[in-house]
Amino acid sequence: SKIHHIDPETGEDSFIDSIFKTHIMKPTHDMQKEVDWLLSVFHDNSGVIAWNDDWSVCMKAETHNSPSALDPYGGAMTGIVGVNRDILGTGLGARPIANTDVFCFGPPNWEGELPDNLFHPSRVFRGVHAGVRVGGNESGIPTVNGAIVFDDRYIGKPLVYCGTVGIMPRKLPDGRESHIKTPTAGD
């Protein structure tokens, strides 16, 4: 949808066709033209930056809110293993080394009414935590940080944000850059 915007500093009057394309993608692509460490963004399964001359770091994060509201354990597990998979599939393959998460739930001690089709926030909390723990830590990828927020506004739908960090060599022994994937017929 088009958004009418007036810049408070310059007074410039403009229309924004897409907040994501205008305020996330465009500045990132503009920066990519100016720096040599931003290797791949908005293209493959995760973003890739040059860590040093020998290694690249990639990261992917996404939400799994609706699936986790319907099935807290399964929804959260598919969220974390999905971003693990995306790291493995970045470029010619990266090694997942760490997971991260942010969870927002209704208060676990909620005593108010709940619609028939909603789970109690404490059930959602326990299920999401277990799903991410089993999908990440128990598959050998440690969760190195996270956050939990409890607020009434998340009673109807939790926020389940999962991310994975991976590493990959900048170049393979044959000289190919590992973040560049060029599939051909028959692969």
What is each residue range found by the language model?
Residues 1-187:
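Long, structured ligand/cofactor-binding scaffold of large enzymes
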